[in-house]
């Protein structure tokens, strides 16, 4: 009888040990599944971008692929339009719709100044990948440009703006001419504002 009790106790201890050591792995797996379920896949982003830029827009897939390689899957996107101009000091104004992976939408506006060697004017469609936005209210702040992050392919441009751990990757396709080097930021607001600062 004592041999049977020892054997049963060993089986129970082994089972308990297996459950305790497997629990962190199960938790990590569910966290990963939850995280990937809260983000847009590459193909979902391409479908959303094509709805703004048009199907088969040359260069669009390349700039989106670059953002995916550098930052992974976004958990929100902004589809909109913007216009701006500069003679040394520039301004940019935009309006769009924030779309979260859960399907919630919200109108947003952005504006921002720039200072530098910059001249010209332009209007653009703007598709922004948003990373690490856990609360949509956190979008409404200033996002400085990330130095050295400008990338061009086939008329499309990509750059990054970042505050804390939230990163924005605006993809633009526009008309007009604006040339130069500048520094600035984008300020997102829940309603239209005329002052770009």
Give, region by region, the residue ranges found by the protein language model.
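N-terminal secretory signal peptides that target proteins for export/translocation
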Residues: 1-6
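N-terminal export leaders
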Residues: 9-13
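Bacterial N-terminal signal peptides
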Residues: 14-24
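Small-residue-enriched, tightly packed secondary-structure blocks
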Residues: 30-197
């Amino acid at each position: 009888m004592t041999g049977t009790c020892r054997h049963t106790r060993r089986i129970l201890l082994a089972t308990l040990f297996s459950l305790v050591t497997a629990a962190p792995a199960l938790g990590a797996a569910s966290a990963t599944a939850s995280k990937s379920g809260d983000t847009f896949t590459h193909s979902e982003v391409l479908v959303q971008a094509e709805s703004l830029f048009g199907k088969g827009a040359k260069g669009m897939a390349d700039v989106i692929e670059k953002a995916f390689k550098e930052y992974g899957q976004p958990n929100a996107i902004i589809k909109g339009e913007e216009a701006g101009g500069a003679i040394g000091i520039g301004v940019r104004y935009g309006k769009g719709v924030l779309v979260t992976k859960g399907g919630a939408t919200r109108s947003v506006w952005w504006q921002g100044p720039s200072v530098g060697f910059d001249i010209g004017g332009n209007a653009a469609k703007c598709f922004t990948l948003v990373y690490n936005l856990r609360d949509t209210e956190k979008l409404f702040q200033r996002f400085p440009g990330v130095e050295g992050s400008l990338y061009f392919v086939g008329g499309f441009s990509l750059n990054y703006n970042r505050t804390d751990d939230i990163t924005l990757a605006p993809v633009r396709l526009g008309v007009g001419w604006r040339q130069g080097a500048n520094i600035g930021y984008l300020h997102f607001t829940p309603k239209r504002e005329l002052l770009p600062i």
